[in-house]
UniProtKB/Swiss-Prot annotation:
GO terms for biological process: fibroblast growth factor receptor signaling pathway; positive regulation of DNA-templated transcription. Gene3D superfamilies: Transcription activator, Churchill (2.60.40.4240). GO terms for molecular function: zinc ion binding. The lineage of its organism: Eukaryota, Metazoa, Chordata, Craniata, Vertebrata. Belongs to the Churchill family. This is Protein Churchill. PANTHER family: PROTEIN CHURCHILL. It comes from Homo sapiens. Transcriptional activator that mediates FGF signaling during neural development. Plays a role in the regulation of cell movement.
Length: 112
């Protein structure tokens, strides 16, 4: 992974978790060939372990195949919630939790 190719390493993306794609706004250009072009996504894999889906892939420079970053995305269901995480030098770090129920219990107000 190459910190010289990105504007900011592991930027905080809040709750924006990307299962695929690239965060091109954070890409300053390839440190090896000095070109700023689209990226290739290679070595994509999907694993399921203990009810958790893990998607990993590499971001590569389209021109010289320099490895810019390794992307990891996870999805799991915990109790009544879907949980997502993303960790990538280029795309950033993020996590999100969404209720699988029609009405999110976290948004309910208690009535006394």
């Amino acid at each position: 992974m190459c910190g010289d190719c990105v504007e900011k390493e592991y930027p905080n993306r809040g709750n924006t978790c990307l299962e695929n794609g690239s965060f091109l706004l954070n890409f300053t250009g390839c440190a090896v060939c000095s070109k700023r072009d689209f990226m290739l996504i290679t070595n994509k894999s999907l694993k399921e372990e203990d009810g958790e889906e893990i998607v990993t892939y590499d971001h590569l420079c389209k021109n010289c195949h320099h490895v810019i970053a390794r992307h990891e995305y996870t999805f799991s269901i915990m109790d009544e919630f879907q949980e997502y995480t993303m960790l990538c030098l280029l795309c950033g770090k993020a996590e999100d939790t969404i209720s699988i129920l029609p009405d999110d219990p976290r948004q309910m107000t208690l009535l006394f």
